[in-house]
């Protein structure tokens, strides 16, 4: 089941198609290549709203070959990982470059995982997380600023290891609040976008 798509800014005309079951396929302009760009089926949990859920290409993908994926891991946790495309074959990712940037516990429910990854006009990586599932957010995650569920998060993936928190994030430096938070009180931000005019 296709759930997301990304177009590289490298002049190739390709499209990357994200399948919830764990593969990313390459459309080369005329057909879908037989060999997946990436296969993470052994790393993810599937069923209900779980799986491989989103992909974002680094703004400099054409030169650094870097991209990011969002998925539910084998324990049902939310995970964001960084990869690079192979130097030898641009249509295949190099699995050896995988680095998990962030894992967010998501206990008890298989729904409300959020899912979208996208780079903003500021060059930072944004992603939405679901509230953890269950009717009415029974754990109160979305309003709890000490957990990352039910939020819009913003991180700087170009500095630090594995990332840094932008100093302009609203909760930075506040006790009991996670600095990655950009917005909170969200139920299940499955998809979002940036205004092309105002950002």
Can you annotate each of these PLM segments?
Residues 80-88, 140-158:
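Beta-propeller blade signature
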Residues 20, 122-123, 130-131, 148-149, ...:
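A fold-level detector for beta-propeller and closely related beta-sheet-rich head/sensor domains
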Residues 132-138, 173-177, 188:
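Flexible glycine/proline-enriched surface loops and loop-helix/loop-strand junctions
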Residues 177-199:
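Repeat-solenoid scaffold signature
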Residues 1-136, 191-194, 198-199:
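Acidic, Gly/Ser/Thr-rich repeat motifs that build Ca2+-stabilized beta-propeller blades
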Residues 107-109, 168-181:
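Short, well-ordered junction/capping motifs at the entry into regular secondary structure
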Residues 32, 89-94, 162-174:
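Blade/loop signatures of beta-propeller domains
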Residues 135-147, 163-167:
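Acidic/polar, solvent-exposed loop segments in beta-strand-rich repeat domains
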